[in-house]
Amino acid sequence: MALLPILEFPDPRLRTKAALIDAAEVTTPAFQELVDNMFQTMYDAPGIGLAATQVDVHKRFMVIDVSEEKNEPHVFINPEIVAKDGGRVYQEGCLSVPGIFADVTRADTITVKYLDRDGQQQELEAGEVLATCIQHEMDHLDGKLFIDYLSPLKREMVRKKLAKQRKHVA
C-alpha cells in the first residue's frame, strides 16, 4: 500500500466532476489497490472520509470510516442520494482545505444507493456524522468544496489564511 498525495484548495483539479465507474472495473486488482491506498491515505492524514477527486482520480467513489476505532470502512461507488430528511449544522473540515473549519448545514438523515467494494448494489440509511460525511465527500465528486457554502467574504478569508499557511511552510 502507498500514501497518495492529497490535492489542496485552490487546486483547480478539485473542481473536476468525477465520472461514473463501470461495474466491471470495481473488482479489478488495480481498483482494489487504489481503494486500499485511499484508506491508508485517509487514516494517515488523519481523516474520516476521502473522495477519489481529492487524490486526483476523477472517478465517482469515496472511502469513509467515521468510527473511533477506525474499524468500519465503507466504500461508496457511484453513490446517489435517494432521500433526505431534516437539517443539521455541523462544523466541517477537509483534508483538501487544511486547518480550516466552518459550520455547514446538511440533511440530518439520508438514504444513499451505491455499489460496494465487491460491486454489489447497496442502500444505506445514514444519520449524524456518517450522513454529513457522505454528503461532504459526494460534493467533492461534483467538484464542490465545503467552503463553497460560505459567504464570498468568508471564502476569501479562507483563501488568504491558506496562502499564509503555505508561505510559513515553504
Swiss-Prot record:
Its EC number is 3.5.1.88. It comes from the Bacteria. Its cofactor is Fe(2+). It catalyses: N-terminal N-formyl-L-methionyl-[peptide] + H2O = N-terminal L-methionyl-[peptide] + formate. InterPro entries: Peptide_deformylase (IPR023635), Peptide_deformylase_sf (IPR036821). Fe cation binds at residues 94, 136, 140. The active site is at residue 137. The keyword Protein biosynthesis applies. One of its GO terms (molecular function) is peptide deformylase activity. Belongs to the polypeptide deformylase family. This is Peptide deformylase. It comes from Stenotrophomonas maltophilia (strain R551-3).
